[in-house]
């Protein structure tokens, strides 16, 4: 992602509606929340998976050296067959190797479901930003979309999960003041 992403904690925000804050800082499973909102009509659409050089802000979020290699997984989280969330999850190669955790095997399964079902994973603080449009797939690219990220840790393994809330989600949730 371009370096103009400014990740903020809840106490650093102002003028954000309570309804938006509720979605951004909900510490439960986003997969479960989306599934409920979609009355079960939820699915994961993988867009990209593979080894890449991690972005600078991702290296910082994972506490690994700038330019580190890692596994990158980008997906849409769909409700009613429409993309509601763009998610990008990354883990450093150095931490993944030998961890017994293989992101390549997820396919159309939700990473969030896996992370929340394994009590060994601990979730770090949630940070939010107005996600840079350049970091989004072309078909949903827009300025000013809210994104959030948090690190899930299990021993030496860290998985950084970023989720960008797309306009159709806010429409479905009945939230206008985004």
Curated annotation (Swiss-Prot):
Entry binding sites for substrate: 73, 111, 163
Major location category of this protein: cytoplasm
E.C. code: 4.1.3.40
Entry's Gene Ontology BP terms: pyruvate biosynthetic process; ubiquinone biosynthetic process
Catalytic reaction list: chorismate = 4-hydroxybenzoate + pyruvate
GO cellular component: cytosol
Top EC group: lyase
GO molecular function ontology, one term from the record: chorismate lyase activity
Compartment list: Cytoplasm
Organism superkingdom: Bacteria
Disulphide-bridged cysteine pairs: none
Pfam families, sorted: Chor_lyase
Keywords, comma-separated and alphabetical: Cytoplasm, Lyase, Pyruvate, Ubiquinone biosynthesis
Pathways involved: Cofactor biosynthesis; ubiquinone biosynthesis
Family per similarity comment: Belongs to the UbiC family.
Role: Removes the pyruvyl group from chorismate, with concomitant aromatization of the ring, to provide 4-hydroxybenzoate (4HB) for the ubiquinone pathway.
Protein name per its UniProtKB record: Probable chorismate pyruvate-lyase
Organism whose genome encodes this protein: Pseudomonas aeruginosa (strain ATCC 15692 / DSM 22644 / CIP 104116 / JCM 14847 / LMG 12228 / 1C / PRS 101 / PAO1)
Record lineage: Bacteria, Pseudomonadati, Pseudomonadota, Gammaproteobacteria, Pseudomonadales
């Amino acid at each position: 992602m371009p370096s103009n992403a400014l990740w903020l904690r809840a106490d650093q925000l102002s003028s954000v509606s309570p309804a938006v804050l509720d979605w951004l800082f909900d510490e439960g499973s986003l997969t479960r929340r989306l599934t409920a909102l979609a009355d079960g009509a939820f699915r994961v659409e993988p867009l990209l998976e593979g080894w890449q050089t991690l972005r600078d802000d991702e290296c910082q979020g994972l506490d690994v050296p700038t330019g580190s290699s890692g596994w990158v997984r980008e997906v849409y989280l769909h409700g009613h067959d429409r993309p509601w969330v763009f998610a990008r999850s990354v883990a450093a190669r150095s931490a993944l190797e030998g961890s017994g955790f293989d992101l390549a095997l997820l396919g159309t399964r939700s990473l969030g479901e896996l992370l929340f079902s394994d009590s060994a994973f601990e979730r770090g603080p949630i940070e939010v930003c107005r996600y840079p449009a350049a970091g989004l797939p072309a078909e949903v690219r827009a300025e000013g979309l809210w994104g959030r990220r948090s690190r899930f840790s299990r021993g030496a393994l860290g998985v950084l999960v970023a989720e960008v809330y797309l306009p159709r989600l806010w429409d479905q949730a009945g939230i206008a003041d985004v």
